[in-house]
Structure formats: C-alpha cells, structure tokens
Amino acid sequence: MSGATAAAEPVLDAIEAGFDDARLALEDLVRIASISADPDRAVDVQHSADATASYLESCGLEHVRQATAAGSPPAVIGEWLHAGPNVPTVLLYAHHDVQPPGYEERWTSDPFEPVVRDGRLYGRGTADDKAGTVAHAAMVKAWLDTAGALPCNVKVFVEGEEEIGSPHLAEFLAEYADDLAADVLVLADAGNWSVGTPGLTYSLRGLAGGDVTLRALDGPVHSGMAGGAV
C-alpha cells in the first residue's frame, strides 16, 4: 500500500461514517427551488447561495463569500490554502442552481421535497448539481477531521447560473481571476458509467454562440422555372 493510499484510508472511513449527515445536508439544499431560469425565483437562488455558503463554512472551508459579476446570480467561493506555496492548488467546481421541474404532474413526488426510494435520493438537484457541492465539502471535512489538514491547497467555486449557460462567466473569471487561480480544476458535474461505477471525464464540449446571416434572391421567381429538378 502506497503512502498516499494509506493516508486516504481513514479519510474514506470518515466519509462513510459521515454519509448520512452529508445526505441530510443535500436534502436541505434540494428543498430550495433555486431555478436560475425563472426571474421570480431570484430570492430562492439567493437563499440557495446563503445555504451553500453556510454549508461550506461548516465543513471547514475558509474565507467563504458570495460573489457576483455584471449582474450575475450569486456564486459562492471558499478556500483552504495551508498546504504550502510549493503544493498544487485544486479548484473544485459545482453549481447550486437547478433546472425547472418541468411537468410536475409527471413527478412521483414533490421535486423540491427530497425522498429516498429504493436506496436512491430523488428531487431536483439531488444529482445536478447540489450533490457536487456536498461531495466537495464533505471530502474537505473528512480530511480535516482525520488528518487535520488537506494534502493540497483547495479552492471551491459554486456557480449560480450554470443551468442558463453561464452568461456572465467570462466577466466573473476576469474579475475573480486571483480568487480562482489553480493548477487543476475538478468538476463534480458529470456522469457515471453505472450505479457504483464512477467515471472520470476529462473534457466537455461547452457552448458556442454566433450569428448566422442568410441571403436569398432579390425578388420572387417561379419555382417551375428557377427550381432545380429533384
């Protein structure tokens, strides 16, 4: 067993022991209808940012604060930077906003009242992506509780507008470049191959926008004379 593996064993045990507490924290976050696509839910998005910040602090992250740029919904930033200047810094990303529930009559239960069925937790945001926030923070807590320190410097960035395409992300990254500077980014917002089989995703397509201009004829023509034979 390598030294790194041996050091991680008690952390994994702590994660297992704290699983129920992490699930309860996730349920509390899921109960907040932080739908970034709905302007009428702006208060809920703010409430979600408040709850996310409180949870990060409770897990031992420091200098936790909310941040906005160019009128964006609130994001949450936190950090733990005591591993030393010659140790890599890892940026952990998640988002606290969610998609609308869609046709609520098709839900078996209230989308914003999490329930456990057959060993699985159901509710809007249980996977995408409030689980990512909890996974990151619970991992930090497990390391601090067992080892007293993290093996690397850690920053956490929990976005508030991912589900609408992150329209202010460029401005946000420019304004908070120093706060988010890191050697590697870990994103807790991808898929697994199957239940119990994790996947390691190393690239995502992202989004690209643009304008398309079409030019047609100056005037109408007879389709039988100008059209081609098909």
Regions of interest found by a model, annotated:
Residues 2-126, 145-150:
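Acidic/His- and Gly-rich active-site-bordering loop/insert found
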Residues 193, 202, 223-230:
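Acidic-enriched catalytic cores of C-N bond-cleaving enzymes acting on peptides and small amides
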Residues 121-123, 218-224:
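Short small-residue beta-strand/loop micro-motif enriched in glycine and branched aliphatics
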Residues 199-215:
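Flexible glycine/proline-rich, aromatic-decorated loop/lid segments
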Residues 121, 125-203:
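Acidic/histidine-rich catalytic neighborhood of metal-dependent amide-processing enzymes
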Residues 27, 77, 155, 209-213:
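Beta-strand secondary-structure signal
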Residues 101-102, 195-196, 221-223:
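Short helix/loop capping segments that flank catalytic or ligand/cofactor-binding pockets
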Residues 94-96, 118, 160-161, 188-191, ...:
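Fold-independent oxyanion-binding glycine-rich loops
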